[in-house]
Amino acid sequence: MGDPVSSKRKSSVSDAVSTSKRQHQQVKVEDVNVPLSSREHSPGPQLHTQQSYYGNGTDGASESALTQSRNNNGATSVVAISDATQNGEDSSNISNNSNAVSKGKAVVNAGHRPVTSCTHCRQHKIKCNASEKFPAPCSRCERMGLHCEIDPQFRPKKGSQLQSLRNDVDELKVKIEYLTRNESLIAKALKQSNIGQNLLQAIKSVDFSYRVAGPTQGQVAKNKISVQTYLTNEPQLLQDSQTTTTNPTTSSNSKVVTPTGSDHSPASHNGGSLSSGKPQLLNDSVPANTKDRLPPVLQIALKRLSQQISSSSPQNSSPTTTGHSPANDLSSSKQHVVATTNAMPLLPSPHANIDEFVLGDVHISIEKATELHNIFVARFLPYFPIMQSNSATELYSQSQLLFWTVILTASLSDPEPTLYNKLSSLIKQLAIETCWIRTPRSTHISQALLILCNWPLPNQKVLDDCSYRFVGLAKSLSFQLGLHRGKFMTEFTRTQTSLPEAEKWRTRTWLGIFFAEQLWASILGLPPTSQTDYLIEKARLGDDGELPPILRKLICLANFQGKLCNVMGTSVVSPDGLMDARERAGSLAILERELERLDVKLKFQEDAAVEIYFLYIKLMICCFAFLPETPTEDQTKYVTEAYLCATKIITLLTKLLETQQLIELPIYIRHSATYSALILFKLYLTPLLLDKYVDSARQSIVTVHRLYRNQLTAWAASVENDISRTASVLEKLNFVLVTHPEVFIEEEGIISRMRSHLTGTLFYDLVWCVHEARRRQMDPNYDAEAAKRNKEKWFKNRRKLYPLPFYNQISKEDFETITQTTPGGTTVTTLVPTKSAIKQAKQLAQSQGDQNGPVTHINGIPLSMLDETGSVNIEGLLANANLNLSNEHSTVLASSSSTATRLNADNPTTDTNKFNVQTVFTHNIKKSSKSSDTPTNKPKFNSTSSIPTATPTSEQRAAHNTKTSASILTGDPNSLFSMNNSLQANIQLNKTLSADSNGTSNNNIPNSTAPLNTPDTNSFNSLTRSPDAPSYGNMNVFYNAANQGTNMNTLYSQSVPNAPQGISAPLSAQPVNVTNIPNGNVNSELDDFFLRQSAGWIEGNSSNDDFLGWFDMNMAPEF
């Protein structure tokens, strides 16, 4: 300033400070109050002191002295007393003042440094420049708008200000709780006076629906309010540099309340323009079109730096509301908030007006979010009860990652995977940013990761699945948060202790981590690392009465599972970690008895999901017995046990699918079914399985394949996960049965190739067979002599291994499906040739010169193969061929040798959604001639063929309690028997196969890739018998007719002498000469068909066998 008084004041303070540095004695003086003139007041720092430092003056008096004064408002001020010239006083006044000071009590305080920092900077222990900028405030007080003062008497408060705030909050909570408990008494007291009644009426008239969270609370929101979760790195290609520069994104978990009714919604500015037309990129991929891309950490630092430079005002630390901002200024005025991943405080009011939630380009209305939230709580959470939630808004306020994870999981119940596909990559990116870039401090983050582990994100290969990494991350975070120490959580965290029932849900989350770690270790064949602790033991012993029964049982099974793996697979004396082969049987017997006692105690069969996992643990015991070098006698006694457990798992899964979709079930149920199918496939290959179980084992494998392929069409076509991967593995294994079946049985034992993946060895062993078969097929230098020796060994000890009848290898244009549910709950699916297929078969017979020849092929598919599997309904074939049977004598010819699939005529099903096969061909088949044939007097089936066919009326359908599959009813061409593997190659093969038989026949092959949208299973039997056995009497009719040259109608009428012309007797009434059947042709046609089918695997699918993700395009060829 230019004021001379101020200059002298500043000079006096400087002299006093400089003088103090040369003195070793300090004299404390009494207070001398000197009032200041108004012109001497300034906003600068005010000095409070009781210490005066004397220089080396001749008369012992200082040129200036510091005294203390107090203004009228009670605020302490610091002033300086100048010399006589400054105050307009004479030297006598100065002398008097000096004498007054000298009368004070002197105290020697050698070496004490004077106070030069203001009180605010001293409280926060930060650097202060108050003495340098005097009389102006220090830099921090000027920036923060604080009152800057220097007070030597000020002492920083002991303790943390945060603790003081906590105490205030606790006090407010107590008062609110008190008022809540006495609300009725307060209301009664208010009603007794007129003023109180007026007050109550005024409160009721206040409308809180328009109150919005934020600093502008109480404003009316005219537009729709959305809350958005921002990502630091959007899973998209980078946009134009200008767009990225002008609209920088912020870190995740930022919450901004903005109106989305305008064109400037946050979603349109986050991560650049969404309308640029560039394809989306997965979140963990690196854009290929960028050369100057910085690492994410540097991007965040650069964006924050640019924001600090360009911003002249500080960012708010609370959500902002821009509901009243002009639309054109919205993007520039909106401030993105950099927040931590702490549990966010609850929204201030249950009536907070949030209309939608935004993540990336996904917008979900509050109604949709509430619907999905309720679906998750009702249909998903009971399988894994580790959390609770009352509303979508409350869940979002607790954790944004948990909220979006719940929305993603609940969207599995949607008929279309549109929302699921959009959210999956975004949530993966959000989880990475939330957990890796910063350290979460909330239990909700661990809960979100556990949900993602139980309902995994889409993945194509085993190593692409990040669920196991999510488990490890949740476990490490939970250790840091003290979830493993229960009631001692206050020693690890303070923010989580105030949550409702914090200890209860933290403990359940820890139990969920223990279970998930054991589960995923067994899925991947890795040793578990979790150790049993106090909380696990407490849950296992049932000491926690509030623990849900399903969670306690799963914890008990997981604990036993860990013990099993530790006993059998952690040996330090063997390189593979396995117990000595000669000692396995004894240890497994002890563990098996312990598991049985556990079953008797906990009754696992009371819950279908728990029973499935219990049977899966039993299969793990069997798998340890099947590992290499285990004596054959020890393996034999576990073969039947493994078969019974696996088939029961598949039966229980079928029952669960009556009320839920397969993709809605948690991974521990789906993996149990997958493991059952794989172990049944292995058992089918070994002669140790009893012959009476072979048919049912094959049926169960096909059932799993059908269930896995017959998801909703849209889901099966666009979502890749463990379900599609398992179905693909089964199909590849089926092709190996055709091309190189010797691969499976070259070595003795059930599991012979792999050994170091614990119970996961089963999966890796089968995948090895797939790769080995491909190598032999594709390698031109394969040792022919070795192949010859292997084949001789295989033919010497072989067991005829028929391929499995997977429906997606058969054209839907040639066969329709009908289904029936038996009283035991087994669903049986039967193939019925379409009218167009029969027509083509007749044309084929005519072209071969046999006008009355039998139908032996349906579009190149030998009926012998279908009859072996029990998949074809011969009577339906005859009905479509106008070989009408009488209503009195016709019977259902369902070749079923297994008890599980035998139809029970005495107890027909009442389920209107299933077929009653016994009524399909035995009712309303009237005697008719060609002239009187009409669609109304005989049953027809809807066909997806290009040739139009008549359909029965709805009354007929209801009367017969029949129903065709959903794809046939809707005419959906993308549903049945579509080629999953190398569609075009299989189409070409079918055409070639048909052309070899008939050069002029038409082939109606579908151009679809999606499987059937029905959870039907397949019925088949007598698969290991040769087609010349008496059980194939249905097909013998055709072969006898082919050998004897008889007419089919004549053949059937011969068995009923009194029957009129055109009425056929039951097929079973015709005696069959087994010796006349062309056995060699049947076998060759069956094998030839599958060999031709397998060519699609060899030629067109060379890149689809890497189920594990072992291979990389950049790997050298020798690898």
UniProtKB/Swiss-Prot annotation:
Presence of the UniProt keyword Nucleus in the record: yes
This protein's encoding gene: SEF1
Stretches with biased composition (Polar residues): 47-70, 261-288, 323-335, 902-913, 931-942
InterPro entries, alphabetized: prtT (IPR051089), Transcription_factor_dom_fun (IPR007219), Zn2-C6_fun-type_DNA-bd_sf (IPR036864), Zn2Cys6_DnaBD (IPR001138)
Residue ranges, compositional bias (Low complexity): 243-260, 306-322, 943-954
Principal location listed in the UniProt entry: nucleus
Its biological purpose: Putative transcription factor. Suppresses the lethal phenotype of RPM2 deletion.
Record localization: Nucleus
Start-end of DNA-binding region: 118-148
Entry keyword Disulfide bond: no
UniProt organism field: Kluyveromyces lactis (strain ATCC 8585 / CBS 2359 / DSM 70799 / NBRC 1267 / NRRL Y-1140 / WM37)
Gene Ontology biological process terms from the UniProt entry: DNA-templated transcription
GO cellular component: nucleus
Molecular function via GO: DNA-binding transcription factor activity, RNA polymerase II-specific; transcription cis-regulatory region binding; zinc ion binding
UniProt keyword list: DNA-binding, Metal-binding, Nucleus, Transcription, Transcription regulation, Zinc
Disordered: annotated span: 1-70, 86-105, 236-290, 306-335, 894-913, 926-962, 994-1018
SUPFAM superfamilies the record matches: Zn2/Cys6 DNA-binding domain (SSF57701)
Protein name: Putative transcription factor SEF1
